[in-house]
Amino acid sequence: MYDEIGEILTIEELMELLYIGKNTAYQLLKSGEIKAFKIGKVWKIPRESVNEYILRKTAK
């Protein structure tokens, strides 16, 4: 699954990858815990931002 996702993720792919719900995904983006950007009303999440988030969480 992880290798099938491109370099830019959608909110749905983020949810599937991290096994989280939509509200949690939006909270992570809005708080800046996962760096992302919006094009219009659509969030775009760089895969590297998700990798960094996972590393920070597993390092604790």
Language-model features: locations:
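Intrinsic disorder/low-complexity segments
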Residues: 13-16, 44, 59
